[in-house]
Design a protein with these regions (language model features):
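Metallocofactor- and cofactor-centric catalytic cores in central/energy metabolism, strongly enriched
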Residues: 5-74, 277-282
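Adenosine-phosphate binding glycine-rich loop
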Residues: 200-282
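Well-ordered, non-membrane alpha-helical segments in soluble/globular domains
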Residues: 37-51, 95-98, 125-129, 133
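Rossmann-like adenosine-cofactor binding region
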Residues: 163-228
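Short, charged/polar "capping" segments at the starts of alpha-helices
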Residues: 66-73, 125, 146-153, 188-190, ...
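A glycine-rich, Thr/Ser-enriched phosphate-binding loop motif common to dinucleotide/cofactor-binding enzymes
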Residues: 83-99
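Structural motif
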Residues: 4-7, 31-32, 62-66, 117-120, ...
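Glycine-rich phosphate/diphosphate-binding loop of Rossmann-like nucleotide-binding domains
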Residues: 104-171
Length: 282
C-alpha cells in the first residue's frame, strides 16, 4: 500500500522531467495546485502506474489535495487502482456516527426514529443493523427487497428479541425519521421519498443532495476521526492526509466483523467531525 502526495514547489528539473520522488511507501509528485494541464496529469499518472506496477501494490491513499483532483483520480481508477476513500469505514462505524449526532444535537435515543436505506445486504450491514437496533428502539429498514429483509426481521426477533420494521412506503417510510442512514440508495431513488423536512441524512456512499424545496434538514456526506491509541504523525506529519483514509487502509475488508470491531475498540476510535454540503455540522 502506498501514499501519494504532491510537492507544490518542485524544483525546475523535477517539474520538467516529471520526476516522482519515492520515500519509503510514499510517492511525492511534482504537482502544483493551480492551472494543472491535463496532459501533464496523464503523464504523471502513467509514471505513478509504472512505479506501483513494480511493487504489485493496488491500494493507494491520496492526500487531501490530490483527492480533489478528479482528473488524476479518474486516470488512476481506469488503471484499476483501489483508492481508499473512507466509505467502507464510514459504514462500519455508522453506529458511532449516530451516537455522535445524537450527542451533538442533544437528541434522546428513546425518542429518535432511525431509518436505514439499504438494498444490498452484507455481513457488515447486517451486524450494524443489529448493533443499531439494540440502542435505538425505533428502527426502520427501507428497502426495495422487502422479502429478503423480512426474513432478517423475523430472525432478529426470534433469535435475539430485536424488533425492526421493514417497509417501502415512499410517502410514509421517512416522513417521521429524525435521522436517516443511507447505505446504498442512489440520488434518483432517494428523491422519490417523502422525507421529514428537518431530518439529518447521512450518506455513506457519496455526496448527495435532497431535491425537495421543503427540506430544511442536514445532509452529511463526509467525516473525520481520531485514534486515541494510534499515532500517525510519521505518515501525516503535515496533516496532508485524512486520518480516516489512513486507518481504513490498514484493514483487510474481508476480515470478520467481530475482528474489525475488536480492532476499532482497541484503537479507541472517536468520530471528531461530520461534514455536510456547507462544511462541518455543529
Amino acid at each position: 500500500m502506498y501514499y501519494i502526495e504532491n510537492n507544490d514547489k518542485p524544483r525546475f528539473l523535477e517539474n520538467m522531467f516529471k520526476i516522482i520522488k519515492i520515500e519509503g511507501n510514499k510517492l511525492i509528485l511534482p504537482l502544483k495546485t493551480k492551472n494543472i494541464n491535463k496532459k501533464y496529469l496523464v503523464k504523471l499518472a502513467r509514471k505513478t502506474k509504472k512505479i506501483l506496477d513494480k511493487t504489485k501494490s493496488k491500494k493507494i491513499v491520496l492526500s487531501k489535495i490530490l483527492k480533489e483532483n478528479e482528473e488524476y483520480k479518474n486516470i488512476l481508477y481506469s488503471y484499476g487502482f483501489d483508492i481508499v476513500d473512507g466509505k467502507w469505514l464510514f459504514e462500519v462505524i455508522s453506529c458511532e456516527v449516530l451516537d455522535y449526532i445524537v450527542n451533538l444535537k442533544n437528541i434522546k435515543k428513546e425518542d429518535t426514529e432511525i431509518s436505514i436505506l439499504v438494498n444490498y445486504i452484507t455481513q457488515n450491514t447486517l451486524e450494524n443493523i443489529k448493533k443499531i437496533a439494540r440502542q435505538y428502539k425505533r428502527l426502520n429498514i427501507v428497502t426495495n427487497h422487502i422479502e429478503k429483509f423480512k426474513k432478517i426481521e423475523e430472525e432478529l426477533y426470534n433469535k435475539e428479541g430485536i424488533m425492526i420494521i421493514v417497509n417501502n412506503n415512499k410517502k410514509k417510510s421517512l416522513s417521521k425519521s429524525k435521522i436517516i442512514l443511507n447505505i446504498d440508495f442512489p440520488k434518483e431513488l432517494l428523491n422519490k421519498y417523502n422525507i421529514y423536512e428537518n431530518a439529518i441524512l447521512v450518506n455513506i456512499r457519496g455526496n448527495m443532495k435532497i431535491a425537495r424545496k421543503r427540506f430544511n434538514g442536514i445532509t452529511i456526506n463526509d467525516y473525520e476521526i481520531k485514534l486515541n491509541n494510534l499515532d500517525y504523525s510519521q505518515i501525516n506529519n503535515k496533516n496532508q492526509y485524512n486520518i480516516r483514509d489512513i486507518y481504513e487502509a490498514s484493514f483487510y475488508k474481508t476480515m470478520p466483523y467481530r475482528e474489525i470491531v475488536k480492532q476499532i475498540n482497541a484503537d479507541k476510535l472517536e468520530v471528531t467531525s461530520l461534514y455536510g454540503n456547507n462544511g462541518a455540522i455543529s
